[in-house]
Design a protein with these regions (language model features):
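Active-site-adjacent structural elements in enzyme catalytic cores
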Residues: 1-242
């Protein structure tokens, strides 16, 4: 384990950070999908940590969701995805953060972000200095494949078509109202994602506030839960403030 990874662990663990290292012979290939590297995470949830300690300090397990759906943030979401495929669920309460962990690859000379998450590039650079972002994440060319499997295909997406409207709010709000009204007139069920400050200015659709605009952690906490609520309600088109 490189010293840079130890510094990052001291700053960010326990928390939503996954680090990738070259595995040793102590790590079975069955737990890495045959790869020579292994992803390690130390969660902040007390129930998860109690389970890990009960298991001897290490647990190898996949994520509690099916590919292509918004990430689960509560036990009910796991039941929806995996209810008939698993024997039990240990409910540790709602996810505190609500976003995926940031994945950082330490098998390269320069630490590389393979999946964006709660910890962004600027946060990591304060600890590590230089940090790269996997070119496959940024590439508009679909032939450039991200290194992390979870970034290669459609993941974390709602069933509805989602459009994010950017710009000054005095233009964004009427534009979303116009688009939502058009879709409703066409027979579509519409959802709108906004912030507390603008909630009362929307007139059409299933309107959900994601929190105060300046509170990034609140917005992160609510994002996937709102997308799943829209799925459950049969929403077909979603418009969101940026």
């Amino acid at each position: 384990v490189p010293e840079s990874a130890r510094k990052l662990a001291a700053a960010c663990w326990p928390g939503p950070l996954t680090m990738i290292f070259e595995k040793t012979n102590a790590v079975p290939l069955e737990t890495t999908g045959g790869l020579t590297s292994v992803a390690v995470r130390y969660p902040s949830n007390k129930v998860a940590n109690a389970l890990i300690l009960a298991g001897g300090g290490f647990i190898a397990a996949p994520s509690a969701n099916t590919s292509g759906r918004p990430s689960p943030t509560k036990a009910e979401h796991v039941i929806e995805d995996l209810g008939d495929k698993i024997d039990c669920i240990i409910d540790g309460g709602d996810a505190e953060i609500g976003l995926e962990s940031t994945i950082v690859d330490f098998t390269e000379e320069i630490p590389t972000i393979l999946r964006p998450g709660y910890y962004n590039k600027e946060m990591l650079e304060k600890v590590l200095g230089t940090v790269r972002v996997d070119p496959g994440i940024l590439a508009e060319d679909s032939h450039v494949r991200p290194k992390a499997p979870g970034m290669r295909y459609k993941h974390y997406a709602p069933k509805a078509d989602l459009t994010i409207i950017q710009g000054e709010m005095e233009r964004v709000i009427p534009e979303i109202n116009r688009l939502a009204a058009e879709q409703e007139k066409a027979g579509k069920k519409v959802g709108v994602i906004c912030t507390d400050e603008t909630r009362e200015q929307y007139t059409t659709g299933d309107i959900k506030s994601i929190g105060l605009r300046a509170e990034d952690e609140t917005i992160a906490h609510h994002l996937f839960a709102i997308l799943r609520d829209f799925d459950e309600d049969g929403v077909e088109v979603i418009y969101s403030e940026a």
